Amino acid sequence: MRERLMAAEKVTGIRWHHGALHLLDQRLLPSQERWLACDNVAQVAAAIRDMAVRGAAAIGIAAAYGLVLALEERLAEGGDWEMDLEEDFLSLAEARPTAANLFWALNRMRDRLQRLRPGEDVLAALEAEAVAIHESDREANLTMAQQGIELIRRHQGSEQALLTYGNAGALASGGFGTALGVIRAGFLEGMVERVYAGETRPWLQGSRLTAWELANEGIPVTLCADSALAHLMKSKGITWVVVGADCIAANGDVASKIGTYQLAVNAMHHGVRFMVVAPSTSIDLNLATGEDIPLEERDADELLDYAGTRVAPQVEVFNPVFDVTPADLIDVIVTEKGVIERPDTAKLAQLMCRKRLH
């Protein structure tokens, strides 16, 4: 199964080659496939902030490589690189404050610097750590795909119709994807007949990115207006909603793309199972509940500009990027460390316990 999944992988959004970071500019998809070459940390921070790269895991990976570029700059300057590098840690951390993976990756890079041996090549060590973060995320996604498909198999009566929202695919990760990884695996196993994708306003990650990823791999996908998703659940025989996560609190509350919360409410009303697929790096046990997760808001122009024209110029705008889905609306959280059905604080703590062997 794992070999089949790897062979089916066609989309990637992050490349590290000869000391340069290349990011597929997701703002331009699907009309243009343009790669950004990032040569310094300022360019990486801007790419994260401006959503050229997006998705919690992808942001963390890009930030890790950004620190490698930052260190290279600081060493060339010849000053106190350790003190100067703190500015770069801060600029990357502030780029997208909701993504738990971003802070996890930055903390892991900081920890690697603190474990340097006497005489060790600091730049080589940090680059190796960034590459390891990238590769481990892809491996985690492959594991989650297999675990998620076993859940779908357990409840399968016939080929199923799945609904996804936002973009939790290869573009949002180190490869293969989280929610879309499960969907890809289900299609390869003959268990997924059709995927419905919500358009995901206002950035249209569903229509621009998810539909593009699935269509590229020959997976039948139907795009739906966000306002049609409740009707879709009622009329089209949806069996699972499968989404990703940007941050998971200690009690199992999940911050994800704005609109996910109302999707979960509708799923419960219609008896549709709700699955969250995310690496354990998205879990922050320091956040007791979803109320503690910082939720980013973006510029009003994203809602007020249409085809270059300002609409409703006199109104105020509420434009949150994420919302929080309470744990009691979630049937299962799938991570590479294991599967949690009906998540709560005790189950999350057990999953993340350092004494676990797997």
From Swiss-Prot:
Recorded catalytic activity of this chain's protein: 5-(methylsulfanyl)-alpha-D-ribose 1-phosphate = 5-(methylsulfanyl)-D-ribulose 1-phosphate
Gene that this polypeptide is encoded by: mtnA
InterPro entries in the cross-refs: IF-2B-related, IF-M1Pi, IF_2B-like_C, Initiation_fac_2B_a/b/d, M1Pi_N, NagB/RpiA_transferase-like
Enzyme class: isomerase
Function: Catalyzes the interconversion of methylthioribose-1-phosphate (MTR-1-P) into methylthioribulose-1-phosphate (MTRu-1-P).
HAMAP family xref list: Salvage_MtnA
Keyword S-adenosyl-L-methionine in annotation: no
Catalytic-site annotation from UniProt: 246
Entries under NCBIfam families matching the protein: eIF-2B_rel, PRK05720.1, salvage_mtnA
Gene Ontology molecular function: S-methyl-5-thioribose-1-phosphate isomerase activity
Protein name as annotated: Methylthioribose-1-phosphate isomerase
Catalytic activity, EC: 5.3.1.23
